[in-house]
Amino acid sequence: MPEVEVELAERLAERLDARPSIGGAEVVSWRFVLGGGWTLRAGLKAGRLGGPYEAPAAARGSGGGVYLRWSDGQCSHGSLDSRSPDDFGDRLAEWRANAYSDPDAPEILPPAPLPKVRTADPAVEAIVDGEPTLLIAWLEQARLRLARDGMARVDAASSVARSWRFVFNSHGLRAAYPETSASLYLAAEELYARSFAKRRLPTESELGDLLEDVAATTPVLGWPTTPPLGEVPVLLAPGLAAGFVATFIVANLNGAGVYTGRSAFSLEDFRRGRQVMREDLSLAIDTLLDLERAASPVSAEGVPGGRATPVQAGRLVRPIVDLKYARRCAFPPTPVPGGSPAFLLRGAEPLRSAEQVRSQLQRGLQLHSVLGLHAQDAASGRYSLVAPHAQVIRGGRSVGRAKVSLSGSFFEHLLDPRTELVAFPWGLNPGLLIWTTVEPQA
């Protein structure tokens, strides 16, 4: 652990432990999360193969947030950076100026045993500390592979990062651990994109799969064709399927929405175990996935990492709650993933592969992206979306692209016996095969 970052966190904790005061109000308890480190990036400039690479760039940064409880019962939230200990008086005045009253404000948690999970890859740390040649090598490999198939327009970006995270509080919590990340984004002809993002480097197999998928899928999406219309089987790729689940299920599991009545689900629904999916489907949260972005031993509030199952065998079990809404809803606080996957959609039956599903579709679509998912009414479960580059499947083969609109109820899809989880070669979450209404778009 770098001495500079350790000293920064310890100095800040020392100042807060001294019970500083503003206008007669003292800080009586506190917690903060602080992080800092290096990021290296490179890319293909202007999105054109054969042109100059975007020069590798290095950036160093630090930041975080603090939560204070004052002697007069008020609370404050504030931001942190590397200057916070030196400018402590001014920062404290800012935090006090933003103080507010909240009868349900969360208490500071005492330290608890933290689970072990790998959050850093030494191979990534070595690249950040040394030469970023691997970032260029990934881009060159992508350039050569796609150029072989005549693709002339590509956007690509690669990055690696190493950092340190400190979660301290006034009750003695002193969690400090390293983090790393590695990512590669590749898009071709403004038609199709794939990415890799974990806390570790990609394997040669993972990198090869990404390149081959982009090389194989992009040409198909370059051929305009007529889409199937009406009620159609539509295969949602994993990233898009996760977007639907996040929008219509995870958003409605949020404790704040449940408590205030803005969710499709009520507290009573959780108490009685309302069925919201088929019995063979479950949704879990897991922060103990080694070297995934989700990996995290402790949240910013001091909640230990772990596993939780908000939906088990299709039935509501517990909302997703922070400390405040854990108290209000009378459910235990939820472990907080450090990144993706934010949740895991699971089925009880073995999954067919995407290739198997496509080969058996006489008429259907595969979707990689849609427009407007974030703007849908999550509480209703209903959607009306446009897919500008829908992959048309006819006779078990991908035959081109079409622009379509699709509409339906995602709640109904998750109860439909025809809905199917589908295994893809990448990611921890599956794709989804749903039956939905498809109409043409000009």
Task: Label every model-predicted segment.
Residues 270-442:
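Dual-mode signal for accessory low-complexity, basic/Gly-rich regions
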Residues 1-293, 312-315, 397, 435-442:
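Active-site bordering "gate/hinge" segments
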